[in-house]
């Protein structure tokens, strides 16, 4: 059985690769490796999420389970004056994300090692963006959803993407249970991008 990308300490033999991509008018280079998600190209779900994601200036963003950092790095480039924190439990992914933040000359982002929300336990954000690790199991995905409101400011948004055949509709139901509603903001190639908003007091 191949090593899962959500393992904390990848042991797989290194196979470095490099991805060059244009996203929303900006060019990016991402260094990747074995033992991280979507090593050879940005996966279609992440592409859809990047196309749908809306971030304004001076906003605080959490890229949860960042992998090699594509979502968070693009968000940082789009949010002038904002700040992005990228987190992952995978040590190799965190090292790659830090390399990619520097390589893309991103000054308004930082990468932290840790499981889910642990590295940001006392923080709240305008946006949480995540391509959830469905293969890690329902308990992990449920925590991403149910703990999100504690880490969002009033009016803050949780953005997730999932394959329809891997439970996107069920995921939308869990988001609705935690937030009161969840909308499909984009769909394509068998994926749905979902968004929930934390209501103000």
Segments (PLM) and residue ranges:
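Class I S-adenosyl-L-methionine
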Residues: 3-15, 168-201
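Class I S-adenosylmethionine
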Residues: 31-53
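General small-molecule cofactor/ligand-binding pocket signal
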Residues: 31, 110-112, 183-185
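Conserved beta-strand signature within the Rossmann-like core of class I S-adenosyl-L-methionine
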Residues: 155-162
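Short "lid" loop at the C-terminus of a central beta-strand within the Rossmann-like core
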Residues: 134-136, 163-168
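Conserved SAM/SAH cofactor-binding pocket of Class I
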Residues: 45-130, 136
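N-terminal auxiliary segments of SAM/dcSAM-dependent transferases
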Residues: 1-24, 34-35, 39
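A short glycine-rich, Lys/Arg-flanked "PGG" loop and its adjoining helix->strand segment in the class I
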Residues: 142-154
């Amino acid at each position: 059985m191949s090593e899962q990308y959500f393992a904390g300490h990848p042991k797989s033999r290194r196979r470095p690769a490099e991805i060059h991509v244009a996203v929303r008018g900006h060019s990016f280079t991402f260094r990747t490796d074995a033992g991280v998600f979507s090593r050879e190209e940005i996966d279609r779900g992440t592409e859809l999420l990047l196309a749908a994601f809306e971030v304004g200036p001076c906003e605080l963003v959490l890229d949860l389970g960042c992998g090699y950092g594509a979502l968070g790095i693009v968000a940082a480039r789009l949010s002038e004056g904002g700040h992005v924190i990228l987190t992952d439990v995978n040590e190799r992914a965190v090292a790659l994300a830090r390399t990619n933040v520097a390589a893309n000359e991103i000054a308004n982002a930082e990468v932290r090692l840790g499981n889910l929300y642990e590295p940001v336990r006392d923080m709240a954000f305008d946006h949480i963006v995540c391509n959830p690790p469905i293969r890690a199991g329902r308990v992990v995905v449920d925590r991403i959803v149910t703990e999100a409101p504690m880490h969002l400011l009033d009016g803050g948004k949780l953005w997730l993407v999932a394959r329809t055949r891997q439970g996107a509709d069920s995921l939308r139901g869990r988001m609705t249970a935690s937030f009161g509603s969840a909308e499909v903001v984009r769909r394509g190639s068998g994926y749905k991008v979902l968004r929930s908003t934390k209501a103000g007091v």
